[in-house]
Amino acid sequence: MESVTVIGAGLAGSECAWQLAQRGIPVVLREMKPEKKTPAHVTGYFAELCCSNSLRGAGLENAVGLLKEELRRLDSLILRCADATAVPAGGALAVDREGFARMVTESVLGHPNITMVPGEVTAIPEGNVVIASGPLTSDALADAIAEKLGGGHTLNFFDAAAPLGTFDSVDMDSAYFASRYDKGTPDYINCPMTKEEYQAFWAELVKAEEAEVHGFEDSGVFEGCMPVEVMARRGEDTLRFGPLKPRGLVDPKTGREPYAVVQLRRDNADGTIYNLVGFQTHLKWGEQKRVFSMIPALHDAQYLRYGVMHRNTYLDSPRLLDRYYRLKSDPRIAFAGQMTGVEGYVESCASGFLAGIELARRLKGQAPLDFPRETAIGALGLYVSNESVADFQPMNVNFGIIPPLDHRVKGKRNKNAELSQRSLAILDTMKEEVLSL
């Protein structure tokens, strides 16, 4: 049996390698960590979550909830590890960041069909290759990819991560546990602000000194990871209608909704580390400490990691890739993960999943397994390969890329839930063939 080289052991690469190995395909997994790390990585584990620890909404009224359920039913390694290391997060699936990455790493390294070869890859290998090196691909490999693709086929945007702080340093006399509208369990720490406190905070935030990031412009930021200071510049109330919105978060001390609320989400299973929800930033570290200390409950907060910003590179995929994430000009090469233009942890996993199982089928002489566009997995593959998309941008999974129902359903949540049920019904008819090893 021919082997496959998978470059990169992030979410997409780990999932892809696992799916190939499960189907009897020998895999050589190349990963430059721990010998060389990117600016966003901290540990040497595979599948390290560099931004939030949340895999977003869990319900089937959310497109990402549907995508997770599809992957879960099809034996995704990433979803299995995420479920096993989940931490309380209201209606979202959030994980113990280190525990999750450790479990993925141990699973991948323990598979008999996967051989790990550490070290940086500087050229595209011969034979069957899946490039899942991520948006922070090293310069040498990025140059090799650019040479293979020709000029003008790589694009970029900027991404940011939020700070991580310790629970013990949060002033709980000025904060309270609650979930929005009391849905689920009260898993979030809520840090309320009065009008005067918020206005003073906003005034300092918009003029705080930013770290230098070569080539950064506000217009080059992905909306889903907009730095909090960039969002604040859009207007004094922008944050209050965004990540700091107080709706449904009644302060038990006053019996009223605060003027603004900063939410903290648990980042590990022990509940000793929390991240500032929506506080992606590229302020200088000293400025982060100064400005964020103006939030009453965080006046003495201790940070384990300050927010950082980095450039993300992705492909002009509609011109380059087919629906299986293969290079149209050279099908022995496939890509997976955020560099294909899918945005988000779960979306990256899905691309690695599909690239892996389709490559395994090709190597076994089997026909491609076409996931229809009614499924979230299929819709993502068709989005990144749709040549009619002129201005290709990274995108999260959403119901807009899935065909509508053939009948009217009252209410958006009900409609989305029915779209999900249709997708899962289709998926269940394919399940046996997908899982055949």
Question: Where do the model's predicted regions map?
Answer:
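Beta1/beta-strand and adjacent pyrophosphate-binding region of the FAD-binding site
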Residues: 1-12
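N-terminal FAD cofactor-binding segment of flavoenzymes
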Residues: 18-79, 373-384
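Dinucleotide-binding Rossmann-like beta1-alpha1 core, especially the glycine-rich loop
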Residues: 48-59, 83-99
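Helical element adjacent to the flavin cofactor pocket in flavoenzyme catalytic cores
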Residues: 97-116
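Predominantly flavin-linked oxidoreductase catalytic cores and closely associated redox partners
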Residues: 110-285, 289-290
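A glycine-rich dinucleotide-binding beta-alpha-beta segment and adjacent secondary-structure elements
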Residues: 276-342, 349-351, 369-386, 392-396, ...
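Internal hydrophobic alpha-helix adjacent to the cofactor/substrate pocket in enzyme cavities
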Residues: 348-369
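C-terminal auxiliary extensions adjacent to catalytic cores
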Residues: 394-437
